[in-house]
Amino acid sequence: MSDAPAPGSMAAELIRFAAWLAARNYSPYTIEQRNTAIGAFIAWAALRGVERPQDVTRPMLERYQRHLFHHRKVDGAPLAFRTQATRLTPIRAYFKWLARERLVLFNPAADLELPRGEKRLPANILSPDEVEAILAGPDLATPQGLRDRAILETLYATAIRRLELIRLSVFDVDYARKLIVVRKGKGNKDRIVPTGARALGWIAAYRDEARPQLVCGADDGTLFLTGKGQAIAPKKLTGRVGAYVAAAGLSKTGSCHLFRHTAATLMLEN
């Protein structure tokens, strides 16, 4: 028996939608995130006997929106408004595409409003002393420790995102001009980020002393490597950075995004 979705079903059209996104140079990460969000809605709809996009109505989408609002995580906490919006936005894009392709007569998600939460500054912002306590965590006697110190310094100096750091190449760092080129960042756009001398010094130390020990086989130029010579997986990076935050014994928790918020805040203050 084939596991392929039934022709004309939302699941089948999702495969076509993902191919359409890829043809328009959306990043694999963005496509995966949209697939996950839309797939969750498709599974929810299937439990209610709805599998064809033509059978989805505006009231049904509003019901799914209420489902997300009342959903509780394992710890009993509700989904943040931003998380709810993140799960609904791909569904709006999916039905907009279905309407454009004339696979539905009208777009039931056209006027679906996204949840709006209060705009607040992040509660967890590190002080300079707290940052230094975290930066002192890696064991500099090991290649991985020197790599991790360079990673932490880069996050703190640039406020770049987790995936942007993972994708950095050795050729993206301009030591003379004190710049880092971020390729295919948010919106699949490139940008140039000023970088401090201290962070560049740690990156150079890692590049010269530790990275050669981590390269395995062909070197594709990825800046930060695992012990197997590969790019670091997003969840792995989150875990390592979060472990250094926890080991510092602070009252605050977080990982890469904590550094991003802290760096952005300090940039505004200075």
Task: Specify the residue positions occupied by each region the protein language model found.
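Conserved catalytic core of the tyrosine transesterase superfamily
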Residues: 1-270
